[in-house]
A protein has these predicted regions:
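Intracellular loop-helix junctions on the cytosolic face of multi-pass helical membrane proteins
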Residues: 1-5, 38, 82, 92, ...
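Helix-loop boundary and gating motifs at the non-cytosolic
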Residues: 2-54, 230-260
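Cytoplasmic membrane-interface "Motif A"-like loop-to-helix N-cap segments
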Residues: 66-80, 294-308, 327
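C-terminal transmembrane helical hairpin of 12-TM major facilitator-type secondary transporters
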Residues: 300-347
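C-terminal ends and interior cores of transmembrane alpha-helices
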Residues: 75, 79-96, 307-325
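Helix-to-loop junctions at the C-terminal end of transmembrane segments
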Residues: 56-69, 284-301, 387-388
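Transmembrane alpha-helix termini and helix-breaking/packing motifs in multi-pass membrane transporters
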Residues: 62, 89, 148-170, 291, ...
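Transmembrane alpha-helices of Major Facilitator/SLC transporters
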Residues: 52-57, 270-294, 305, 309-312, ...
Length: 424
């Protein structure tokens, strides 16, 4: 029996693993497929489907711990993710790279969603109400994974393309082979150090489809019986509409050629701007948002956070008009937009947590997060088609106009919060 009393043996690597494939799925895949020659409409549509496991989370989340232990799920999903990344590396130089890689990314996305749930569950089971240092370590390594995936991996791919004279498939293949090797080594590490809590199948209970649908139906009915549930749902679906539209197109705009209206950043420049400067801005915004909510409460900060989520999007409109060559200016614009998003996103999460408090709060929180994934998935799927139809500049104007949806959602959220306070 190994000594697992020290959570620092497995917690940092667990949350690094949690973040790494997620960012590869949502961000790096977008850069990859753009470099493979797909249109913006195709890239946005295909990669947005990777959100589906999180949209379907209410259907499978309650049953993960019933089937097996969290440790078992973590180790199973980690080897699947690692093998999937290695298989993607194998297929990228081949003639059938698109179909094969999409199928493998699809497998990895479901495994990643299951891994996220199991990792969070294990953290809560093992850590309990510990001091802030443990939470800080967890958050730091998740952010570090974002930096490595969105920054370093993309930079390495760009450098390999220079070495191999623009061979996109082979260069990205080497990146994914390296990623796969790292993930599989981490899987071995976790197999040694993640604590055993009980036999893997101590309470084996596989629910039938009818039982699953029945329980999800009951949970959903109780959710919508909450006062102002419709207002809250509209908030969850509309508050992040501008970000949903930007999530894919902002990446494509940065790396698309100038003849198509993009900035034409190289992978190395993109890794610096989005993967380093942007991630730093997102982290800073999140820290400031959490401190603001802690000191002033969500009702006080909801409007400022809604504005911070929308107004900084004008940075992309500025970039599309002036097309600066100075990487510092591009980095500053991305930094400001990400600070605003990180700051505003805190209000979104805190509203969901506040609204679902009470009976079945865990199940209702899962449902709320499914709405959150859906609020990004749907606009992102069609954002590429819209951008191709109107061009980048007009698209960013449309994004700013979509801020009206955020304003409406904020008004409904304030009404809901006031009504909730009045009932206390």
């Amino acid at each position: 029996m190994q000594n697992t009393d020290n959570p620092l043996r497995w917690l940092p690597s667990l949350y690094f693993f949690k973040g790494l494939p997620y960012v590869v799925l949502m961000v790096v895949s977008t850069v990859l497929y753009k470099q493979m020659g797909l249109s913006n409409a195709e890239v946005a549509f295909y990669t947005s489907w990777f959100y589906l496991p999180w949209v379907l989370k209410p259907f499978w989340h309650p049953y993960v711990s019933r089937i097996a232990t969290r440790r078992w799920w973590i180790l199973l999903t980690e080897i699947i993710i690692g093998a999937s990344m290695g298989s993607i590396a194998f297929t990228l130089p081949s003639p059938f790279n698109l179909q094969a890689s999409l199928a493998l990314f699809w497998v990895a996305s479901f495994s990643c969603a299951f891994h996220n749930v199991s990792a969070d569950g294990l953290y809560l089971d093992e850590m309990g109400p510990r001091h802030n240092l443990i939470y800080f370590i967890r958050t730091t390594f998740y952010r570090l994974a974002t930096f490595v995936a969105q920054g370093i991996l993309v930079m390495v791919a760009g450098n390999l393309q220079v070495m191999y004279r623009g061979s996109m498939g082979y260069s990205w293949s080497l990146v994914f082979y390296g990623l796969s090797l790292f993930l599989l080594l981490t899987w071995i590490w976790h197999g040694i150090f993640i604590p055993y809590t009980q036999p893997a199948f101590k309470q084996l209970s596989i629910p039938g489809i009818r039982q699953v649908l029945g329980e999800v139906s009951d949970t959903t009915k109780l959710f919508f019986r909450k006062p102002y549930a419709i207002y809250a749902t509209i908030f969850m679906l509309l508050f992040k509409l501008p970000e949903g539209l930007l999530s894919k197109v902002s990446i494509l705009f940065l790396i698309d050629g100038a003849h198509r209206g993009g900035l034409g950043l190289s992978p190395q420049e993109y890794g610096l701007v989005a993967g380093t400067i942007g991630v730093a801005g997102l982290s800073l915004g999140g820290i400031l948002g959490a401190k603001a909510i802690a000191h002033g409460g969500i009702k006080r900060w909801l409007w400022p956070m809604a504005l911070s989520l929308t107004i900084p999007n004008a940075a992309y409109l500025y970039l599309s008009y002036y097309m600066p060559d100075n990487i510092f200016i591009v980095g500053l614009c991305v930094f400001l937009e990400q600070v605003g998003y990180g700051f505003g996103f805190v209000a979104y999460i805190m509203f969901i947590k506040r609204f679902v408090m009470g009976y079945l709060h865990k199940a209702h929180l899962t449902l709320g997060k499914a709405f959150m994934a859906l609020s990004i998935m749907l606009p992102a799927m069609f954002s590429g088609f819209l951008q191709q139809a109107v061009g980048y500049r007009t698209f960013f104007i449309i994004v700013l106009c979509s801020s009206i949806a955020t304003i409406i959602a904020t008004i409904l959220a304030i009404i809901t919060l006031k009504a909730k306070e009045a009932r206390k």
